Amino acid sequence: MSPMLQIAAEEMENPLIPPIPELVIGLIAFVIVFGFLAKKLLPNINKVLEERREAIEGGIEKAEAAQTEAQSVLEQYKAQLAEARHEAARLRQEAQEQGATLIAEMRAEGQRQREEIIAAGHAQIQADRKAAASALRQDVGKLATELAGKLVGESLEDHARQSRVIDRFLDELDDKATTAEATR
């Protein structure tokens, strides 16, 4: 064979197209493998894929439920916090009002006690003044009687008369003192 014929013969066989018997055997093998995969492996793969899809969807649903629950808990927390703040403000207001009331009561009580102490002091001063005036009258009367007795040179022992004279004299002095104070 000449080299030209050989090239022509080689050109007749296309290396890209397989021979027919190999093509038939390959096709039969492919159908068998595909059938086996479709019967045995494909359902398992589909089952796993379905489970994954359900798990993902379930996870999403769980996440959405958890997010909804978290949002609900957050809203409850915010409501409780607002209520606690309101309650704290109310308690603070009550404490301020009670404090103001207590201060007013204590001031009134202090004022009342002060008035009582002042009144008791005035009463005590008045009583002490009367006692001092009485003691002074007696002492002045006694001294006046002794002085008069020394001046006259005799004893003035008539006590009733002596008391009347001294009381009248001291009353006149009191009246003059009262009149002098009133004119000021």
From Swiss-Prot:
<dbReference type="InterPro" id="IPR028987">
    <property type="entry name" value="ATP_synth_B-like_membr_sf"/>
</dbReference>
<keyword id="KW-0813">Transport</keyword>
<keyword id="KW-0406">Ion transport</keyword>
<comment type="function">
    <text>Component of the F(0) channel, it forms part of the peripheral stalk, linking F(1) to F(0).</text>
</comment>
<feature type="transmembrane region" description="Helical">
    <location>
        <begin position="16"/>
        <end position="36"/>
    </location>
</feature>
<dbReference type="GO" id="GO:0005886">
    <property type="term" value="C:plasma membrane"/>
</dbReference>
<comment type="subunit">
    <text>F-type ATPases have 2 components, F(1) - the catalytic core - and F(0) - the membrane proton channel. F(1) has five subunits: alpha(3), beta(3), gamma(1), delta(1), epsilon(1). F(0) has three main subunits: a(1), b(2) and c(10-14). The alpha and beta chains form an alternating ring which encloses part of the gamma chain. F(1) is attached to F(0) by a central stalk formed by the gamma and epsilon chains, while a peripheral stalk is formed by the delta and b chains.</text>
</comment>
<dbReference type="Pfam" id="PF00430">
    <property type="entry name" value="ATP-synt_B"/>
</dbReference>
<keyword id="KW-0472">Membrane</keyword>
<keyword id="KW-1133">Transmembrane helix</keyword>
<comment type="similarity">
    <text>Belongs to the ATPase B chain family.</text>
</comment>
<keyword id="KW-1003">Cell membrane</keyword>
<dbReference type="InterPro" id="IPR050059">
    <property type="entry name" value="ATP_synthase_B_chain"/>
</dbReference>
<dbReference type="InterPro" id="IPR002146">
    <property type="entry name" value="ATP_synth_b/b'su_bac/chlpt"/>
</dbReference>
<keyword id="KW-0066">ATP synthesis</keyword>
<dbReference type="GO" id="GO:0046933">
    <property type="term" value="F:proton-transporting ATP synthase activity, rotational mechanism"/>
</dbReference>
<dbReference type="GO" id="GO:0045259">
    <property type="term" value="C:proton-transporting ATP synthase complex"/>
</dbReference>
<comment type="function">
    <text>F(1)F(0) ATP synthase produces ATP from ADP in the presence of a proton or sodium gradient. F-type ATPases consist of two structural domains, F(1) containing the extramembraneous catalytic core and F(0) containing the membrane proton channel, linked together by a central stalk and a peripheral stalk. During catalysis, ATP synthesis in the catalytic domain of F(1) is coupled via a rotary mechanism of the central stalk subunits to proton translocation.</text>
</comment>
<keyword id="KW-0138">CF(0)</keyword>
<dbReference type="InterPro" id="IPR005864">
    <property type="entry name" value="ATP_synth_F0_bsu_bac"/>
</dbReference>
<keyword id="KW-0375">Hydrogen ion transport</keyword>
<keyword id="KW-0812">Transmembrane</keyword>
<protein>
    <recommendedName>
        <fullName>ATP synthase subunit b</fullName>
    </recommendedName>
</protein>
